[in-house]
Amino acid sequence: MDDRAHGPAGISQPLSPDLLQRLNAWWRAANYLSVAQLYLLDNPLLRQKLTLDHIKPRLLGHWGTTPGLNFIYVHLNRIIKERDLDILFIAGPGHGAPGLIANSWLEKTYSEVYPAVSQDIEGMTRLCRQFSFPVGIPSHAAPETPGSIHEGGELGYSLSHAFGAVFDNPDLIAACVIGDGEAETGPLATSWHANKFLDAARDGAVLPILHLNGYKIANPTVLGRIPSDELENLLQGYGYAPLFVEGDDPDIMHRHMAEALNVAFAGIAKIQRAARVEGHIERPRWPMLVLRSPKGWTGPKTVDGLKTEGFWRAHQVPFTIADKPEHLSLLESWLKSYRPEELFEESGALKPEIASLAPSGERRMSANPQANGGNLPRPLQIPDFTLHAVDVDYPGARTAEATFVMGQFLRDIMRANETNKNFRVFGPDETASNRLQALYDVTDKTWNAAFIAEDEHLDPTGRVMEILSEHTCQGWLEGYLLTGRHGLMSCYEAFIHIVDSMVNQHAKWLKTARGVPWRRPIASLNYLLTSHVWRQDHNGFSHQDPGFIDHIANKKSDIARVYLPPDANCLLYITDHCLRSWNRINVIVAGKQPEPQWLDMEEAISHCRAGLGIWSFASNDQDSEPDVVLACAGDVPTLETLAAADFLHTHLPEVKVRVVNIVDLFALEPQTRHPHGWSDKDFDTLFTKDKPVIFAYHGYPSLIHRLIYKRTNHSNFHVHGYQEEGSTTTPFDMVVRNRLDRFHLVGDVVDHLPKLGAKAAYVKQWLRDKFAEHERYIVAHGEDLPEIRHWRWPE
């Protein structure tokens, strides 16, 4: 491989021979410890002849990307010390965790947070033994890894996390290593455009480092195989000024890397000075690095006669030993090639002259407080949500757009935190569509690309972030939260599935971080899902899917929350509650269309705190046991349930009806399964032990059955919900198609009340006639029957 560096010209100072020697020594030490973690149970410094007893029985982990990460890390340490920089290290290829852990131990951070992994031979032994080992630590840059906010297991999110971390963090620079395999993912490909949303005056900076080692697990990488000029043009087209460092000779590569970083950080400083001192507002061309080095650099060049270094065979553990004991000598030679006797003291600690390369205190990347919930995270200032209460003289008296009311509350939160600058709202081009446009009274949408005269609400300093990529929005928000700030993401309900696997990763991070004593809590990941399944009659079947709730319901009960507020006042309370919470994933599903408002603010607060409860105004069983319970969860199911109750009160007044509304979905679960769950005694009191429960639910009915399957009366629950029936049609036809409408609910009541006798036949006939009338009317008029459109709860 040719050794060369090229890119924009800049200031560069050559490395002194002493500094070059110490940089290379640190790199060798990090590489040595990385290999030792992959292979060794004991004898970490080869003080004894290496035997099979010293080798782990199962070799788990990844070598290929690790030496490149170690190379980058030590050079960033040099620049941190020289310029006193605040740098957050993000490893897109998080499977290179042996390197991150090795550097953390060399910087002594690891021993500070895990005192048993001490700075001596005993600590080094524990460091090696624990890696990818039962009751040890994972193989990726998981929450157990000091300095990490990005596990890098599922690839694609490193760059969006990096930008999220530096928003409103003017002194922070995120050095983000992007693997060339990761660069092939959709989320990463989009996140290059995040530079159009960065304000050099207010935000920090991101230094993307594209690590081209040429191979994935078993294939070449696209960016590793296209011509260099094509790659350079691509990166310039994204708006970056790429600097290339390419080769495999360590001495030459150290010099080129130092030169490139000098140029890059001088460029960042120049851009920030121009924006912050001179007031330049044009979007700059930020520097970035392209490091082309061999996969498995410094490892065995061949194994069993097959090319390994610089090839995909170096991706994981380059060779096994248990089935090929002759490889033991190969491992010993490999480890000794780093000359550990020159690197470590007799005690096992790193030699002082090499250790002096590490920054001190919080300047160490492994000890950066930004990677642990942020530097002195500030609580969100939340004004009184009751100031936005919708006046409700009696149930259904007022009509309001719930999310529009929520938007006014979010506007006041944004205003209250203008000084702290620690709150942002994210969404994929849907903020106004989701009725949150009141935010634009106090801020605009972040935008740092070109402007035209007709543009509205675009500004480099805006705090509403919109890009048509759910992945990028969530990556930004996660990076923002993980560094100590607060936020909310709004999205069309059907399309939040795009980030299904992404929220999996965040849930796993939160679950694991709870068990790491030194990890600080972070603000919750809050979703507003609107433009939901029951009001996507205009966009059709492709926009109709409530299944994200089911996805979240699979997560740990101490993390996952799902709220289905039936009206605006309940939504205000739930929004306030979620924004005050920590270490949660909160999903709020609410409508944006004009809908009846049911509860005044005092009633809404009481109802939401309980999670579920009887709506007395809609019930007539106060003096006796109910004949039937009508349960509902979700705004449209609530509307249809109340219309069904109205029908029963009017036409079948002898039927005793209890109406129960559910806001907190997991209140349905037993207390033994979820902290918000109701006790069996209270649940039975509410839903009865033996009466039919006709349940109108926002999503897929099977979830309700799953949540309540251990309840006494489970077999009497008859759940109506989304049945995967949809089209471009009328709002009421959507619920009819899925048997969630008031008439199907009434029919189900009749079917489960034998006491109605012959009267049931006449009611069922009336219902059949009504369905036929409904179909004729919508086909003829293109809208719902007047009695549907104009129905109101009786005063």
From Swiss-Prot:
What is the superkingdom listed in this entry's lineage? Bacteria
Q: Which cofactors?
A: thiamine diphosphate
The record's listing under InterPro entries reads: Phosphoketolase (IPR023962), THDP-binding (IPR029061), Transketo_C/PFOR_II (IPR009014), Xul5P/Fru6P_PKetolase (IPR005593), Xul5P/Fru6P_PKetolase_C (IPR018969), Xul5P/Fru6P_PKetolase_CS (IPR019790), Xul5P/Fru6P_PKetolase_N (IPR018970), Xul5P/Fru6P_PKetolase_ThDP_BS (IPR019789)
Pfam families, alphabetized: XFP, XFP_C, XFP_N
Alphabetical UniProt keywords: Lyase, Thiamine pyrophosphate
Recall the GO molecular function terms of this protein's record: aldehyde-lyase activity
Q: Name one GO biological process term.
A: carbohydrate metabolic process
List the HAMAP family: Phosphoketolase
- Family, per entry: Belongs to the XFP family.
Q: What is this protein called?
A: Probable phosphoketolase
